[in-house]
Amino acid sequence: MVQSSLRFNGSVWCNLDIALRNLDQLFGRAIQPLGLTIIEWYILRALYERDGQHASELARAVGRAATSFTPNLDKLQQKGFIERRPDPTDRRAVHIYLTSLAEQHREEVLNSARLVDQQIRKMFSDEEFETFQSIVAYLQTLEPDYSENSSDYKNGQLGERRG
C-alpha cells in the first residue's frame, strides 16, 4: 500500500474528493472505447440491474438530482442505448428501458468495471480492501437531500444514515 500524508490538514472531504477524481480518470480511460461518459455508464449499470425504472428512481440510483438528469438520458437515447416509455399510471412519468444495442454491449460495460476494480484491489491487502469496502458501504447509507433548499449543511448535518 502507498503511504503518504493526506492533504489539506487531513480533511476527509477534500482527500476523498481528490481520490474520487483520480479514480474517475482511471475509469474514464477504461470506458473510453465504449464511447460512454461515466454518468452514462452508471445509468446503464443501474438499468442492467433493474430495467424499466422511473427516470426519478434512476437519478437517485446513480446519485443525481432528478431535476438535472434529463440531459444525461437524452444523450443515451441519442446514442441508441435507452428508450423512454410513458408510465401507464402517471402521465407525467416515464420508464427508462435498455435497447437491443445496450444489451449487445452489456458484457463490455460490466467488464470495464471488473478491470478497474481488479487494478484497485491489487493495491491493498485483503484486510485493507475489506475495511475500505466497509467504509464505502457505510458512506453510501447516508441519505443526501438533493433539493435545492436543503438546510442540512447549515444545521451541521450532511445527511441521515439509511437502514
Tell where the protein language model's regions lie, with residue ranges.
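Charged, amphipathic alpha-helical coiled-coil/dimerization segments
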Residues: D24, D74-A137, T141
